[in-house]
Amino acid sequence: MPSLTMTDSSYIGRFAPTPSGFLHFGSLVAALASWLDARAVNGRWLLRMEDTDPPREMPGARDAILQTLERYGLHWDGEVVFQSQRHDAYAAVVDRLFNMGLAYACTCSRKQLESYNGIYPGFCRNAGHAREGAAIRLRVPELIYRFTDRVQGEYQQHLGREVGDFVIQRRDGLYAYQLAVVLDDAWQGVTDIVRGADLLDNTPRQLYLQELLGFSQPRYLHIPLIVQPDGHKLGKSYRSPPLQAEHATPLLLRALRALGQETDPELLLATPAEVLAVARAQWRPEAIAQRTTVPEADLR
């Protein structure tokens, strides 16, 4: 896998929020990490809206996300990509995988599977169900998939034993995250993925799908999640407060500390653009803690 250079203009990163709510501090840490990692090597930073699940989308969230990123100085390159406009591309790949026998229809209910701890037992693997009204699962091999994360180090997962065949299209017709993210990263030419450590165990599934479709493997950097005292990550479902424009500078500095970066107290009087300019020049991804969570209470 190629290494990063100080001026790697071939670098293409991305931030891919879900418009199910407003951006919060945890979102900021992820966006800032991916932005800095791209800008520090003069790379491109793309923005993709992962809006494949309309029932979960919050009215006004799309525009609010764009406005918040702009007010915090996190400007992106090119046009925003909306996954809701990419359904034809997803459908073509699902059809291809199904017709090749690499995917199959699954009629299992959540209740049937709830005692299997998220590992699909293969009930429908050889059942030959019709596609109508069924989910589509991708067959996985009995293999271990490994990769080296730039922060978390070596990671491996036995797909067959630890995951099982996974859904690429839901029974309601909506496309699964695992499919959409792989297709869109390849289509956009993404070379580097910087995201939260909650997606670390998703990566082997994505590596397998990349391999199956002949895509290049990006570099991965999974940052620690910011968690509340009860251990839950900051998120929309826990009513984490949305980012406010008037707090941009102190929150950017706090996010930098969450990423292990040094901050100068004098920057509290700086503009967001000035904070980002300094952070970009001093970006050290190797300073990010090799852990999967950071308690919010530990951040001053």
Swiss-Prot record:
Record note on cofactor: Binds 1 zinc ion per subunit.
Motif ('HIGH' region): 17-27
Motif 'KMSKS' region per record, residues: 233-237
Residues reported in the UniProt entry to bind ATP: 236
Keyword Metal-binding: yes
InterPro entries: Glu-Q_tRNA(Asp)_Synthase (IPR022380), Glu/Gln-tRNA-synth (IPR000924), Glu/Gln-tRNA-synth_Ib_cat-dom (IPR020058), GluQ/Sye (IPR049940), Rossmann-like_a/b/a_fold (IPR014729)
Gene Ontology terms for molecular function: ATP binding; glutamate-tRNA ligase activity; zinc ion binding
Known cofactor(s): Zn(2+)
Binding site for L-glutamate: 14-18, 50, 177, 195
Alphabetic keyword roster: Aminoacyl-tRNA synthetase, ATP-binding, Ligase, Metal-binding, Nucleotide-binding, Zinc
Top EC group: ligase
GO biological process, one term: glutamyl-tRNA aminoacylation
Keyword Metal-binding tagged: yes
Residues at which Zn(2+) binds: 106, 108, 120, 124
CC annotations in GO: cytosol
Enzyme Commission number(s): 6.1.1.-
Function: Catalyzes the tRNA-independent activation of glutamate in presence of ATP and the subsequent transfer of glutamate onto a tRNA(Asp). Glutamate is transferred on the 2-amino-5-(4,5-dihydroxy-2-cyclopenten-1-yl) moiety of the queuosine in the wobble position of the QUC anticodon.
Similarity field: Belongs to the class-I aminoacyl-tRNA synthetase family. GluQ subfamily.
NCBIfam families to which the protein is assigned, alphabetical: PRK05710.1-3 (NF004314), queuosine_YadB (TIGR03838)
Protein name: Glutamyl-Q tRNA(Asp) synthetase
Gene it is expressed from: gluQ
